[in-house]
Amino acid sequence: MSSKYIEVPSNAMLLERDMDKTPVLETMHLGIDFGGLTAVDEFNLTIGRTEIVGLIGPNGAGKTTVFNLLTKVYQPTRGTILLNGKETSGMNTVQVNKAGIARTFQNIRLFSALTVEDNVKIGLHNSMNAGMFSGILRLPRHWKNERVAHERALELLSIFEMEDLANHQAGSLPYGAQRRLEIVRALATNPSLLLLDEPAAGMNPSETAELMENIRKIRDTFQIAVMLIEHDMNLVMGICEGIAVLNYGKIIAKGTPEEIQNNPQVIEAYLGKQKEDGQ
């Protein structure tokens, strides 16, 4: 992979992050009810600074609801969320994104008529300091920020070897490339925790293997944590250091991939069901 644009964090930055032992995410007794239905209950999870954690479970178990709680699409009925040691109660989706959580979605949500680079620049918006009037009046600060955004967008695209596609229309990209672009755009917000909702959906085995390599590269290069929802068990077991299994809105098991694979409750509730279905 070309390293022309890759920006590796400084040794001082990496040392600072390494010295900070505060978990990137802690949830305590997190839950939400919709009417009289409990969708998620007693969701307790801790994610370390550079951990890759998987959240698995049958369809309808509440996995995406958990992501919606973490990103404040939904406000929890009960419980506490600590992001980098600080409570997120009262925050909205924009505020929690600025505080350090970025995500992708099950369904691609790109601006298909814009270029690849412009999609990444939209993700960079929160970290840019240019005001509205500097943009309208085309002040020097505006042009400086445009230059910085262009360079940063290419740096991020190079992680997935997509810098040569910068001027292509996002909607013209193959499906797998569009999913990678979503991850790049999420990274552009400079998160400390990246949430990936079924990142391998629609990918062939070769693309999935490349995705695994790139997720590790993202974690190692930017020293961030990654939490993913995924039905591809080869990906989950191959990349995650910790796994939580959700069933009917509750965590039924937490542990290493090996521990999860050998957990009777998990085999019955999820992995075993897949075997019965011949998957």
Q: What does each model-found stretch correspond to?
A:
Residues 2-279:
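Glycine-rich phosphate-binding loops of nucleotide-dependent enzymes
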